[in-house]
């Protein structure tokens, strides 16, 4: 049995919630015939080394302290030919360990130094930039979520152009399903949606980068009597507070709900337009938002602030700008958008990463 060493927090049970955990879990499934060792490194935590065994001995999980267990880390790195690092965040703690003569794979996840700079942490961004360059010099394989991400890093580090780049977005399949017409009709009746209503949807939370306040402002500004707005969020209280602060007219028709991922599909299936307002930034250009792909799959036409989000733009997705007169929009779905979603989601299965790592160095 082949062996691989992952630097990541192994997601167990109900911890498989956020995007990072879902991706780690999904990649792990591609190595189900390998023995996997997971290392989680703490700076102030794990004073005592923790060890857990799962999957009938096929998975070893270690939680260690960077300073107290440095010898253990040295030996376990030396023992493994294949090393897989989930995100630059996990490599930062390995900066002073030599990974030469190993087959190193970096799952990029996102543009971490740029994310830190965007968040205002310029010092930490500079440190991560040094780490990133060193890792790109050392690693052999790079997992990207989009072609845009691949192109960005090859432009940033031209010396990597001959290395192995694999495009591998991870999209949840929870809401990728056909919805029966009778279920759609039942939901419309429940919500009070009329036959001639144009349905707008927002699916997301209240983080600043999701621009939910701007979304609500746009909904209110361009609303007409036959517009119905659905806001799906895990932060009902936060969205309600924003809505109340903007004091929409009584004629403004909307609902705010929190639903399970498996219930998203039926709401998407009755919507014509979906808000996804992202700022113009490299973080968004190289991304592959699950929400956008879900919108496209159901033929929803995205309402955008910045149109170059991931590979959807280069594939020619149908969209409208949030500054257009949205009051003029009519009922409409896009077959082209669904085709694009199928192309993008197929990248999940047409490249099994473990097949690229068969040769020991």
Task: State the predicted function of each range.
Residues 240-273:
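Nucleotide-activated donor-binding/catalytic signature segment of Leloir-type glycosyltransferases, i.e.
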Residues 73-91, 102-105:
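Short N-terminal targeting/anchoring amphipathic segment
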Residues 5-7, 194-210, 216-219:
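Conserved donor-binding/catalytic core segment of Leloir-type glycosyltransferases
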Residues 1-47, 217-225:
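N-terminal subdomain of nucleotide-sugar transferases
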Residues 19-22, 321-361:
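A charged, aromatic-enriched C-terminal amphipathic alpha-helix characteristic of glycosyltransferases
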Residues 133, 137-181:
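Donor nucleotide-sugar binding/catalytic pocket of nucleotide-sugar-dependent glycosyltransferases
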Residues 70-78, 92, 112, 123-144:
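Membrane-proximal helix-turn-helix segments that form the acceptor-binding/catalytic region
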């Amino acid at each position: 049995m082949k062996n691989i060493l992952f630097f990541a927090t192994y997601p167990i049970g109900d911890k498989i919630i956020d995007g990072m955990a879902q991706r780690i879990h999904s990649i792990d499934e591609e190595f189900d015939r390998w023995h996997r060792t997971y290392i989680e490194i703490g700076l102030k935590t794990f004073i005592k080394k923790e060890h857990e065994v799962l999957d009938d001995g096929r998975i070893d999980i270690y939680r260690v302290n960077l300073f107290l267990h440095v010898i253990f880390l040295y030996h376990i790195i030396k023992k493994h030919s294949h090393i897989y690092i989930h995100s630059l965040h996990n490599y930062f703690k390995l900066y002073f360990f030599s990974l030469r003569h190993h087959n190193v794979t970096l799952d990029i996840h996102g543009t971490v130094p740029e994310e830190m700079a965007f968040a205002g942490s310029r010092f930490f961004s500079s440190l991560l930039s040094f780490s990133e360059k060193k890792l790109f010099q050392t690693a052999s394989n790079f997992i990207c979520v989009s072609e845009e991400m691949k192109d960005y890093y090859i432009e940033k580090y031209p010396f990597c152009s001959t290395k192995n780049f694999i495009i591998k977005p991870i999209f949840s399949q929870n809401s990728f399903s056909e919805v029966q017409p009778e279920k759609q009709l039942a939901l419309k009746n429940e919500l009070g949606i009329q036959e001639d209503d144009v349905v707008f949807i927002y699916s997301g939370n209240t983080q600043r980068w999701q621009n939910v306040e701007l979304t609500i402002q746009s909904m209110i500004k361009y609303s007409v009597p036959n517009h119905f707005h659905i806001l799906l969020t895990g932060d009902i209280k936060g969205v309600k507070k924003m809505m109340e602060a903007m004091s929409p007219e009584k004629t403004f028709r909307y609902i705010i709900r929190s639903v399970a991922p498996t219930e998203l599909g039926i709401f998407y299936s009755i919507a014509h337009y979906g808000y996804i307002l992202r700022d113009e930034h490299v973080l968004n250009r190289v991304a592959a938002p699950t929400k956008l792909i879900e919108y496209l799959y159901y033929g929803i036409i995205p309402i955008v602030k910045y149109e170059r989000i991931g590979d959807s733009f280069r594939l020619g997705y149908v969209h409208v700008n949030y500054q257009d007169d949205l009051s003029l929009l009519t009922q409409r779905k896009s077959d082209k958008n669904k085709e694009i979603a199928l192309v993008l989601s197929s990248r999940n299965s047409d490249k099994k990463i473990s097949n690229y790592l068969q040769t020991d160095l």
